[in-house]
Amino acid sequence: MSHVPTAGTVPYPQTAAVVLAGGLSSRLGQDKARLRLPAQDGHSLLERTRQLALHFVPHCWTSCRSARQRDCEADVLVDFMPGCGPAGGIYTALTRAAGQGFRDILVLPCDLPFLDEITLQRLFLTHATAPPQTLLTAYAAAESGRMEALVGIYAVTALPFFAKALQEGQRAVRDIIPARHQNLIFYTSADSRPFLNLNTPEDLHTVKSLLASCR
């Protein structure tokens, strides 16, 4: 049964979202998804990201590696193929989205404390005017060309590429969608703050310092 709402409820009713929160957070030493940072209204990183996504789309899942990981939270998607990392989470979300009548999914990681509405709005507007063969609209660093594959909009028609990649043991998300099906938005180092993520205690210190300077 389709869960796509009536047009006008949200800006992009044919898109669902998934927040990837299945990582071990081993380098950080604590569950980054549950981390609460100063000057962010007391929300965890996961909840902040979910709320941000729901400004644009009608439904947002949380992708986890096991049911126990998020046993107190709603809208959890447990990976169909455990041990595949973010690629497995995206594959699961694409499968669920296709089954519920959505056209695209917005993919976001849970550990970007500076991700904002402006960045997501640009992503959606660019995707809306992308060439018809586009399966992925994502950001990429202008200096290095490195794609932010976990901040992107994937068409549900990208599902066969993920299925094939996982069957073949391919786990690197940025290598799954061929370049001819990508639509990239390039950003400079001066505009890179929305993509600053949390992996280590040093990253956490940097983020807290930046948040303090913004007060």
Per-region residue spans from a language model:
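Nucleotide and nucleotide-moiety/phosphate-recognizing core
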Residues: 3-170, 178-194, 201-214
